[in-house]
C-alpha cells in the first residue's frame, strides 16, 4: 500500500515496512552464504548495513539499508494496523484520487501545488521525480498556490498522475543510483524523464526550444 510493504503473520501481528531511499530486502536459505534466493539476483549479501534479520523455518529475510531512512513497525492488532493507514492519503494511482478529491484538498490551501502533491497525508505514493514529471506533462507551474489551481489543471494532474505512474511501473521504475526492482534489474523509466535530471537540456515539448532550468521550491 502506497510506499509501504505489509507482512501479516499467523499470530495476528502486522509488520509495516518502509524501505526509505536505499533499503533492500534479501531472502536467503539458512545455510547459504550468498543471496541466490534473493529478489536481487545471485549477488553476495552486503557485508555492511544489515540491520534486521528475520529467521524463518527454511530461510531468513535480511533488511539492508546504508542510509537508514527506512523503518519496520510491528503492530499487534488489526485496529492499530488500520489506524496507521488512516493517516495516509489515497494512492495517486487509485480510483479514489480523482478530480473531486483533488479539488477538495486544494481548496483554501496556500501551499504550492508541488509540495501539496508530495504530502503523503493528502496523496500517497508520489515522490519528487514523479511530481516533477506529472506537473510538466499537466502544464502546471509547480510554484502555483494550490487554491488557485483551475479545474482543467486539476483534471490534467489526475490524468497524468495515473499515466506516468503506470508507465513507470511498466518500465520497472526509475533507477537513480542504486535502485533495483524485485527481479534484481535496474528500471528504465529514467530514459523517459522530461524534466527531472535534465538541467540545461532542451525542452522536449513540441515547438519549444527552451532550456530546462533547476529551481528550488523548498529545502
Short names for language-model regions:
Residues 6-8, 55:
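Short, well-ordered beta-strand micro-motif
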